[in-house]
């Protein structure tokens, strides 16, 4: 398959940006899914620990992007179970 892509790129150089953008998008999507699977507290791979989200403290950042929140200054607002 890679040989076909390289062959098409040699025959039609105008397709090179298309291949670059598709490859970049596929790589970014794969890395984002890997990040969600490994670092998201809602995903539980180990069945012996059924609720991993209860171990997160109020200072843990688990969002991908937060605009104006400084997690180091947050107070604990939830009860202990």
Swiss-Prot record:
N6-acetyllysine: residues bearing it: 10
Source organism superkingdom: Eukaryota
TM annotation in the entry: 15-37
Phosphoserine PTM positions: 66
Keyword field: Acetylation, Electron transport, Membrane, Mitochondrion, Mitochondrion inner membrane, Phosphoprotein, Respiratory chain, Transmembrane, Transmembrane helix, Transport
UniProt cross-references to Pfam families, sorted A to Z: B12D (PF06522)
Subcellular location: Mitochondrion inner membrane
Mode of membrane association: Single-pass membrane protein
Subunit details: Component of the cytochrome c oxidase (complex IV, CIV), a multisubunit enzyme composed of 14 subunits. The complex is composed of a catalytic core of 3 subunits MT-CO1, MT-CO2 and MT-CO3, encoded in the mitochondrial DNA, and 11 supernumerary subunits COX4I, COX5A, COX5B, COX6A, COX6B, COX6C, COX7A, COX7B, COX7C, COX8 and NDUFA4, which are encoded in the nuclear genome.
Entry function: Component of the cytochrome c oxidase, the last enzyme in the mitochondrial electron transport chain which drives oxidative phosphorylation. The respiratory chain contains 3 multisubunit complexes succinate dehydrogenase (complex II, CII), ubiquinol-cytochrome c oxidoreductase (cytochrome b-c1 complex, complex III, CIII) and cytochrome c oxidase (complex IV, CIV), that cooperate to transfer electrons derived from NADH and succinate to molecular oxygen, creating an electrochemical gradient over the inner membrane that drives transmembrane transport and the ATP synthase.
Family recorded in the similarity comment: Belongs to the complex IV NDUFA4 subunit family.
Descriptive protein name: Cytochrome c oxidase subunit NDUFA4
């Amino acid at each position: 398959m890679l040989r076909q892509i390289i062959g098409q790129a040699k025959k039609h150089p105008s397709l090179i940006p298309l291949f670059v953008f598709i490859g970049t998008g596929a790589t970014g999507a794969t890395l984002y899914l890997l990040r969600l699977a490994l670092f998201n507290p809602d995903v539980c791979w180990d069945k012996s620990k059924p609720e991993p989200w209860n171990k997160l403290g109020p200072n843990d950042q688990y969002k991908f992007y937060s605009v104006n929140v400084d997690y180091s200054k947050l107070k604990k607002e939830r009860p202990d179970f």
